[in-house]
């Protein structure tokens, strides 16, 4: 299998989260690995969290399994059950359909780096957020009452 040259894959901190939910992830820099490498059956992202950055809002996926492998630094995993420190080599897994909102927060003074792996677009049927008035579907972001946010979702 060919080695991936990360320097050849665009790194971005774009988010589709509507304001004010977008602020916490401004220090999240990621590279989408699947499109430039030809992967079609799952998605993968190489993610760098700057100090104080969040990986996302606390969320779950209805149709997509998710796995994370910490490869540098450390971060705090926040889930419904509480907080857990993840360090190099630690793995976290969230089965699809389990409404256990999760995200990482980098509370250290150094960058942390992880790889996130999911089912990809064909399994992206939506999900929700534990702490805020936000749901996601393939075609956008919505309030829990069903009204649409004026924001472009970036899966």
Predicted regions located by residue number:
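Active-site donor-binding loop signature of nucleotide-sugar glycosyltransferases
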Residues: 35, 51, 88, 119
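Conserved short histidine dyad/triad with adjacent acidic residue
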Residues: 30-32, 45-61, 99
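Short, charged/polar surface micro-motifs in flexible loops or helix N-caps
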Residues: 50-54, 74, 83, 98-99, ...
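A short, N-terminal "cap"/entry segment at the start of jelly-roll beta-barrel domains
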Residues: 1-41, 127-155
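Short hydrophobic/aromatic patches on the structural cores and recognition surfaces of FHA
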Residues: 73, 89, 104
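Short, conserved beta-strand element in jelly-roll/cupin
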Residues: 46-50, 61-77, 117-120
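Short acidic-glycine-tyrosine-enriched beta hairpin
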Residues: 81-96
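Ligand-binding loop in jelly-roll beta-barrel domains
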Residues: 38, 96-123
């Amino acid at each position: 299998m060919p080695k991936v040259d990360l320097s050849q894959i665009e790194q971005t901190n774009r988010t589709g989260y509507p304001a004010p939910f977008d602020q916490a992830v401004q220090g999240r820099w990621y590279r989408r690995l699947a499109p430039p490498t030809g992967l079609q059956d799952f998605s993968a992202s190489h993610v760098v969290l700057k100090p104080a950055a969040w990986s996302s809002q606390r969320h779950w996926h209805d149709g997509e399994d998710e796995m994370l492998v910490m490869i540098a630094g450390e971060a705090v995993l926040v889930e419904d059950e509480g907080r857990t420190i993840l360090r190099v080599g630690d793995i976290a897994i969230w089965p699809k359909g389990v409404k256990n909102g999760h995200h990482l927060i980098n509370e250290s003074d150094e960058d942390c780096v992880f790889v996130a792996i999911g089912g990809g677009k064909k399994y992206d049927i939506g999900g929700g957020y534990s702490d805020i008035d936000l749901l996601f579907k393939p075609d956008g972001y919505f309030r829990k009452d069903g009204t649409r946010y004026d924001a472009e979702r970036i899966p």
